[in-house]
Amino acid sequence: MNQILNTVHISNFKSIGSCTLSNLNRINIFIGKPNVGKSNIIEALSLYSIPFLVESIPRKLTSLVRLENELELFHNGNNQLAIEVSSDIGICSLHYNREQGLYGELNLIEDFYRIQIDDKLKVKGLKLLNNQQPQVKLYNFQTNIKFKKSHAKYLIPPYGSNLLSVIEAHPNLKKNVMELFKENNLEIVFDKASQTIKILKKVGSDIFLIPYNSIADTLQRLIFFQSAIFSNSGSVLLFYE
């Protein structure tokens, strides 16, 4: 994957009044004491992923950012100033007024989106003026996700609702996943018709089918993040861990 982020500037977002990150590398890890703003940096960058909420359930901003109302997005509640995240790939800005509510623009190198978010924090309007997807993708592991079929070759942010399709579409990924279960004398079964994943366990002459969501969270988490990495190229991937 080519490095496509070198410098990021964040302003007026949650606890961040103004912050510049420079000389970013291919892999960047934010480490620090609790409540110093590490997650807010990830959340600010995740605003680039708003267009992917169209393919997600629910289509709410809370899938990317922790908040209960619009004003929590703005530094010290100051909605007179716009939230702005600028980087090598473009600018994302969010604004608020009583008439329009929360709205914004995502101005990328080859794409432009107009964003409208209602008072329930649901993405209501998303106008794409070109035909490319954003290069920044936030992935947030959740259990009990209902999988669905998708033509997307990449894992759909933020929850990976097309996990089954992605594993099937990438032979090396599928091989890795099957090996993970083989180590525990288990087999993975893909039901394409119902878009479900089952785990097959053999005990003597008996066969048991175990729901995917019943296996250990650690194993589900590993498969989720492997799928995100295998299915993306030329993208910036954001992980909570």
Task: For each feature predicted by the language model, list its residue ranges.
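Phosphate-coordinating catalytic segments in nucleotide- and nucleic-acid-processing enzymes
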Residues: 2, 51-240
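Walker B catalytic carboxylates
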Residues: 11, 240-241
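Pre-Walker A-like glycine/lysine-rich segment at the N-terminus of P-loop NTPase domains
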Residues: 1-48
